[in-house]
Amino acid sequence: MFLAYEAIKMWKKTALYVLAGLLMGLAVCIRVTSIFILLAIMVWILVSRNWKKLLQWGVPTLTGMILFSILWQGIYQYHVDFDTSESAITVEHFVMMGSTGDGMYNWDDVLFTKSFATHEERAENNRRVWLQRVRENGLLGNLKLIIKKEEIVWGIGASGYSQYVENVVEQTPCYDWMVGEKSGLFRAYMQAYNIVLFALILLGTVTMISKKKSNPYMWIIGIYWCGALVFYIFWEAHPRYSVSIVPLLTMLIVPCLEICLFDMNHGQ
C-alpha cells in the first residue's frame, strides 16, 4: 500500500492496490485482526474528507480482496469437500471467554461451547452467557476486567513465548537460560524492553497529536492501535496477540525522534 501511495503512474497505483487487496485477503484468513489496518485507512480518509482518495484506494483494494475470496473459496471447497460450519467455534465464543476471570483462554468455556450440536445453538448460548457475565460483573467489575485484559495483551514483555517451547526434545543450557530455571534475567530483559518501547510509543503518539501537521501514515497507525485497543475490550486476551501489532506501532516513535534530532542539530 505504501508503494501504491507513492507511485506516480495511475496504472501502477491501481495494480499495486489490487495486489495489496489480494495480500490483505490472505492476511485476514490467517488472522482476522489484519483487517484493522484497512479500517484505519478508511477512517483516516473519511475524517480527512478526501473522497477522491477513498475511490482511488478503496475500489482496487476491495477488488483485490474479492478476487482473493473467490480464489480462496474455490481452493477451500476443492480440498475440504464437507461442511465445517457445524463443528466450527463461534465468534461469540471468544467474546464470552473474554468476559470472565482474567479474560484469557479457559478450557471450561471450550467444553461448554462444544457441548452444543449446531452452530446456531453455540452462538445463542455464547451470547446468553456473555450477557449474564457482563451483568454479574457490574460496571466496576467490567472496568477492572478491561484493564486486566489490556495489561495482558500489551504489558507482558515475554508475549507468552514459553508455552511454545515447553515440549522440546532436549533441554540444553540455552533452554535453561531462556525458558528454564535460569530464565529470570532473560524475562526481566524482555519486560524492561517492553516498558521502554511502549513509553517511547506513547511519547511519540503525544508528540504526533500535539503537532499541527503530522504524517498521514502516523495517524493511520494511531487509529489502527485505537481499533486494536477497542477490539481487546471484548475479545479473549493473550500476550501473543500484540506480537503482530507492535512492529507497526514502533513507527509511532518517529515523531518523537524527529523532534530529538531537530533539537540536537540546533544545539538545544
Outline where the language-model segments fall.
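Membrane-proximal stem/loop segments at transmembrane-domain junctions that anchor or position
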Residues: Q77-Q171
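Membrane-interfacial entry segments at the cytosolic side of transmembrane helices
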Residues: K13-A15, N50-T63
